[in-house]
Amino acid sequence: LDDNGGKNIQIISKIESQEGVDNFDEILELSDAIMVARGDLGVEVPAEEVPFMQKMMIRKCNKAGKPVITATQMLDSMIRNPRPTRAEAGDVANAILDGTDAVMLSGESAKGKYPVEAVKMMATISKRTDEFKKFKTVETPGGSDISVTEAISSGAVSTSHALDAKLIVCWTKTGRAPRMIRKYGPTVPIIALTDNEQTARQLALVRGVRAYVAKGLDKTDDFFAKAREIAANHEEANKGDLVVMVTGISKEGTTNTFRVERVGE
Protein backbone atom coordinates (compact mmCIF):
# COMPACT_ATOMS: atom_id res chain seq x y z
CA LEU A 1 0.00 0.00 0.00
CA ASP A 2 2.78 2.43 0.93
CA ASP A 3 4.53 1.91 -2.40
CA ASN A 4 1.35 2.57 -4.40
CA GLY A 5 0.03 5.74 -2.81
CA GLY A 6 -2.08 4.01 -0.18
CA LYS A 7 -0.10 4.91 2.92
CA ASN A 8 -3.18 6.26 4.70
CA ILE A 9 -5.47 3.36 3.79
CA GLN A 10 -6.37 1.50 6.98
CA ILE A 11 -6.45 -2.28 7.35
CA ILE A 12 -9.32 -4.10 9.06
CA SER A 13 -8.33 -7.68 9.89
CA LYS A 14 -11.15 -10.23 9.86
CA ILE A 15 -10.75 -12.94 12.50
CA GLU A 16 -12.58 -16.04 11.30
CA SER A 17 -10.42 -19.02 12.28
CA GLN A 18 -8.64 -20.66 15.20
CA GLU A 19 -5.35 -19.60 13.65
CA GLY A 20 -6.50 -15.98 13.73
CA VAL A 21 -7.41 -16.29 17.41
CA ASP A 22 -4.12 -17.99 18.26
CA ASN A 23 -2.17 -15.16 16.62
CA PHE A 24 -4.51 -12.36 17.64
CA ASP A 25 -1.98 -10.22 19.50
CA GLU A 26 0.35 -10.09 16.50
CA ILE A 27 -2.53 -9.41 14.10
CA LEU A 28 -3.89 -6.62 16.30
CA GLU A 29 -0.51 -4.92 16.46
CA LEU A 30 -0.36 -4.70 12.66
CA SER A 31 -4.03 -3.79 12.11
CA ASP A 32 -5.93 -0.52 12.27
CA ALA A 33 -9.17 -2.27 13.27
CA ILE A 34 -10.55 -5.78 13.85
CA MET A 35 -13.68 -7.56 12.65
CA VAL A 36 -14.91 -10.44 14.82
CA ALA A 37 -16.56 -12.73 12.23
CA ARG A 38 -18.50 -15.04 14.53
CA GLY A 39 -20.25 -17.08 11.83
CA ASP A 40 -17.10 -18.25 10.08
CA LEU A 41 -15.30 -18.60 13.40
CA GLY A 42 -18.09 -20.83 14.70
CA VAL A 43 -17.54 -23.28 11.85
CA GLU A 44 -13.99 -23.95 13.00
CA VAL A 45 -14.27 -23.79 16.79
CA PRO A 46 -16.90 -25.14 19.21
CA ALA A 47 -19.94 -22.86 19.45
CA GLU A 48 -19.57 -22.53 23.22
CA GLU A 49 -16.10 -21.01 22.78
CA VAL A 50 -17.13 -18.22 20.39
CA PRO A 51 -18.63 -15.84 23.01
CA PHE A 52 -15.46 -15.93 25.08
CA MET A 53 -13.25 -15.38 22.04
CA GLN A 54 -15.45 -12.42 21.11
CA LYS A 55 -15.10 -10.90 24.57
CA MET A 56 -11.34 -11.43 24.56
CA MET A 57 -10.89 -9.72 21.19
CA ILE A 58 -13.12 -6.77 22.11
CA ARG A 59 -11.25 -6.30 25.39
CA LYS A 60 -7.84 -6.33 23.70
CA CYS A 61 -8.98 -3.93 20.97
CA ASN A 62 -10.30 -1.52 23.61
CA LYS A 63 -7.01 -1.71 25.49
CA ALA A 64 -5.07 -1.02 22.29
CA GLY A 65 -7.32 1.89 21.33
CA LYS A 66 -8.31 0.29 18.02
CA PRO A 67 -11.87 -0.04 16.66
CA VAL A 68 -13.55 -3.45 16.72
CA ILE A 69 -16.56 -4.62 14.70
CA THR A 70 -18.78 -7.47 15.91
CA ALA A 71 -20.37 -9.19 12.91
CA THR A 72 -22.39 -12.11 11.58
CA GLN A 73 -25.76 -13.61 12.59
CA MET A 74 -26.61 -10.74 14.93
CA LEU A 75 -30.25 -10.53 13.80
CA ASP A 76 -30.25 -13.67 11.67
CA SER A 77 -33.95 -14.45 12.08
CA MET A 78 -34.80 -11.13 10.41
CA ILE A 79 -33.72 -12.63 7.11
CA ARG A 80 -37.15 -14.30 7.25
CA ASN A 81 -39.12 -12.47 9.97
CA PRO A 82 -39.94 -8.79 10.58
CA ARG A 83 -38.82 -8.92 14.23
CA PRO A 84 -35.75 -10.45 15.90
CA THR A 85 -35.76 -13.03 18.66
CA ARG A 86 -35.18 -11.73 22.18
CA ALA A 87 -31.93 -13.67 22.26
CA GLU A 88 -30.71 -11.77 19.19
CA ALA A 89 -31.62 -8.43 20.76
CA GLY A 90 -29.60 -9.46 23.80
CA ASP A 91 -26.68 -10.50 21.60
CA VAL A 92 -26.47 -7.05 19.99
CA ALA A 93 -26.79 -5.29 23.34
CA ASN A 94 -24.18 -7.46 25.04
CA ALA A 95 -21.63 -6.84 22.29
CA ILE A 96 -22.10 -3.10 22.84
CA LEU A 97 -21.86 -3.48 26.62
CA ASP A 98 -18.62 -5.41 26.13
CA GLY A 99 -17.16 -2.41 24.29
CA THR A 100 -17.53 -3.06 20.57
CA ASP A 101 -17.29 0.02 18.34
CA ALA A 102 -19.63 -1.27 15.65
CA VAL A 103 -22.21 -4.00 15.10
CA MET A 104 -22.66 -5.29 11.57
CA LEU A 105 -25.43 -6.92 9.59
CA SER A 106 -24.72 -9.23 6.67
CA GLY A 107 -27.38 -11.58 5.31
CA GLU A 108 -30.11 -9.61 7.07
CA SER A 109 -29.57 -6.60 4.81
CA ALA A 110 -27.94 -8.32 1.81
CA LYS A 111 -30.54 -10.97 1.03
CA GLY A 112 -33.19 -10.83 3.75
CA LYS A 113 -36.87 -10.03 3.35
CA TYR A 114 -36.72 -7.13 5.82
CA PRO A 115 -33.45 -5.22 5.25
CA VAL A 116 -34.75 -1.79 6.27
CA GLU A 117 -36.44 -3.16 9.38
CA ALA A 118 -33.24 -5.00 10.34
CA VAL A 119 -31.16 -1.83 10.12
CA LYS A 120 -33.74 0.14 12.11
CA MET A 121 -33.92 -2.58 14.76
CA MET A 122 -30.14 -2.71 15.17
CA ALA A 123 -30.03 1.08 15.48
CA THR A 124 -32.82 1.03 18.07
CA ILE A 125 -31.09 -1.63 20.19
CA SER A 126 -27.77 0.21 19.93
CA LYS A 127 -29.25 3.54 21.00
CA ARG A 128 -31.09 2.00 23.94
CA THR A 129 -27.97 0.17 25.10
CA ASP A 130 -25.91 3.36 24.99
CA GLU A 131 -28.57 5.05 27.14
CA PHE A 132 -28.36 2.23 29.68
CA LYS A 133 -24.60 2.23 30.06
CA LYS A 134 -21.97 4.47 28.58
CA PHE A 135 -18.39 3.52 27.78
CA LYS A 136 -16.30 1.46 30.15
CA THR A 137 -13.29 3.08 31.73
CA VAL A 138 -9.91 1.58 30.91
CA GLU A 139 -7.22 1.62 33.57
CA THR A 140 -5.30 4.91 33.63
CA PRO A 141 -1.85 4.49 32.04
CA GLY A 142 1.40 4.96 33.86
CA GLY A 143 5.13 4.64 33.27
CA SER A 144 7.58 5.99 30.75
CA ASP A 145 6.42 3.76 27.89
CA ILE A 146 3.19 5.65 27.15
CA SER A 147 2.99 8.49 24.65
CA VAL A 148 2.21 12.11 25.44
CA THR A 149 -0.98 11.81 23.37
CA GLU A 150 -2.18 8.86 25.42
CA ALA A 151 -1.41 10.53 28.75
CA ILE A 152 -3.21 13.74 27.73
CA SER A 153 -6.19 11.76 26.40
CA SER A 154 -6.51 9.82 29.64
CA GLY A 155 -6.30 13.05 31.64
CA ALA A 156 -8.94 14.72 29.49
CA VAL A 157 -11.36 11.84 30.06
CA SER A 158 -10.69 11.79 33.83
CA THR A 159 -11.31 15.54 33.93
CA SER A 160 -14.56 15.20 32.00
CA HIS A 161 -15.75 12.62 34.54
CA ALA A 162 -14.69 14.66 37.57
CA LEU A 163 -16.27 17.91 36.35
CA ASP A 164 -19.34 16.38 34.67
CA ALA A 165 -18.37 17.99 31.36
CA LYS A 166 -20.88 17.56 28.54
CA LEU A 167 -18.52 17.34 25.54
CA ILE A 168 -14.94 16.61 24.58
CA VAL A 169 -13.76 18.48 21.49
CA CYS A 170 -10.38 17.59 19.98
CA TRP A 171 -8.20 18.50 17.03
CA THR A 172 -6.63 15.69 15.00
CA LYS A 173 -4.66 15.22 11.81
CA THR A 174 -4.49 11.43 11.73
CA GLY A 175 -7.36 10.35 13.99
CA ARG A 176 -5.09 9.09 16.77
CA ALA A 177 -6.20 11.64 19.39
CA PRO A 178 -9.94 10.78 19.33
CA ARG A 179 -9.13 7.06 19.27
CA MET A 180 -7.02 7.47 22.40
CA ILE A 181 -9.74 9.55 24.07
CA ARG A 182 -12.33 6.86 23.26
CA LYS A 183 -9.98 4.24 24.74
CA TYR A 184 -10.32 5.71 28.23
CA GLY A 185 -14.09 5.49 28.36
CA PRO A 186 -15.65 8.96 28.17
CA THR A 187 -19.35 9.11 28.99
CA VAL A 188 -19.91 12.13 26.74
CA PRO A 189 -19.72 12.65 22.96
CA ILE A 190 -16.33 13.22 21.36
CA ILE A 191 -16.25 15.86 18.62
CA ALA A 192 -13.19 15.53 16.38
CA LEU A 193 -12.13 18.42 14.16
CA THR A 194 -9.75 17.69 11.30
CA ASP A 195 -8.65 19.27 8.05
CA ASN A 196 -8.34 15.84 6.41
CA GLU A 197 -11.48 14.41 4.80
CA GLN A 198 -10.10 10.87 4.81
CA THR A 199 -9.43 11.06 8.54
CA ALA A 200 -13.01 12.26 9.12
CA ARG A 201 -14.40 9.29 7.17
CA GLN A 202 -12.21 6.79 9.01
CA LEU A 203 -13.32 8.11 12.39
CA ALA A 204 -16.92 7.17 11.56
CA LEU A 205 -16.03 3.67 12.78
CA VAL A 206 -14.90 4.82 16.24
CA ARG A 207 -17.56 4.59 18.92
CA GLY A 208 -18.76 7.87 20.37
CA VAL A 209 -16.84 10.03 17.88
CA ARG A 210 -18.37 12.46 15.41
CA ALA A 211 -15.84 14.01 13.05
CA TYR A 212 -16.11 17.30 11.15
CA VAL A 213 -13.85 18.68 8.46
CA ALA A 214 -12.71 22.16 9.48
CA LYS A 215 -10.30 24.12 7.31
CA GLY A 216 -8.22 27.11 8.29
CA LEU A 217 -7.58 26.17 11.92
CA ASP A 218 -3.84 26.70 11.61
CA LYS A 219 -3.40 28.32 15.01
CA THR A 220 -4.32 26.95 18.41
CA ASP A 221 -6.56 29.95 19.09
CA ASP A 222 -8.46 29.18 15.88
CA PHE A 223 -9.19 25.67 17.16
CA PHE A 224 -10.41 26.93 20.53
CA ALA A 225 -12.69 29.47 18.81
CA LYS A 226 -14.19 26.75 16.59
CA ALA A 227 -14.56 24.40 19.57
CA ARG A 228 -16.50 27.09 21.45
CA GLU A 229 -18.77 27.59 18.45
CA ILE A 230 -19.50 23.86 18.15
CA ALA A 231 -20.14 23.50 21.88
CA ALA A 232 -22.54 26.44 21.86
CA ASN A 233 -24.62 24.78 19.14
CA HIS A 234 -24.42 21.16 20.29
CA GLU A 235 -27.57 19.47 21.58
CA GLU A 236 -25.72 17.91 24.53
CA ALA A 237 -24.35 21.19 25.91
CA ASN A 238 -26.20 24.20 27.32
CA LYS A 239 -24.96 27.61 28.36
CA GLY A 240 -22.81 27.27 31.47
CA ASP A 241 -21.94 23.60 30.88
CA LEU A 242 -18.29 22.57 30.89
CA VAL A 243 -16.47 21.37 27.77
CA VAL A 244 -13.02 19.75 27.58
CA MET A 245 -10.93 20.90 24.60
CA VAL A 246 -7.93 18.81 23.51
CA THR A 247 -5.25 19.87 21.02
CA GLY A 248 -1.54 20.23 20.35
CA ILE A 249 0.62 23.29 20.92
CA SER A 250 3.87 24.01 19.08
CA LYS A 251 4.75 20.51 17.86
CA GLU A 252 2.58 19.30 14.97
CA GLY A 253 1.38 15.72 15.28
CA THR A 254 1.46 15.69 19.08
CA THR A 255 -1.57 16.13 21.32
CA ASN A 256 -0.04 17.77 24.36
CA THR A 257 -2.60 19.98 26.07
CA PHE A 258 -6.22 20.30 27.11
CA ARG A 259 -8.29 22.91 28.86
CA VAL A 260 -11.78 23.30 30.25
CA GLU A 261 -14.21 26.09 29.31
CA ARG A 262 -17.83 26.93 30.00
CA VAL A 263 -20.25 27.18 27.11
CA GLY A 264 -21.18 30.78 26.38
CA GLU A 265 -18.39 32.38 28.39
What are these regions (language model features)?
Residues 1-265:
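Non-catalytic helical/linker scaffolds that mediate oligomerization, partner binding
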